[in-house]
């Protein structure tokens, strides 16, 4: 299933204002429920990260880590991932458990209870 993107500035601002937040040294995660019943992802990389090459690498790493966590996320959430300077030097395999923990704290993951 393809992830929908958050593209409008209004959507980003709404999630920043009303969403829940968890921060780590590598990534900041904002989560807010939406009425679409679908998962939407927004990525933010500021110029503090470095030049265009570093920012694009940070985005690729975040996307790859999110792809691994995606099947565990409940539908109906908007998620914004903000890259930090350490994101550029982190592999997506190291970022996946961090994202899983953050989304779990924010209540965006499906329960793993098996009957």
Language model features by range: what are they?
Residues 1-115:
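Positively charged, solvent-exposed patches that mediate nucleic-acid binding
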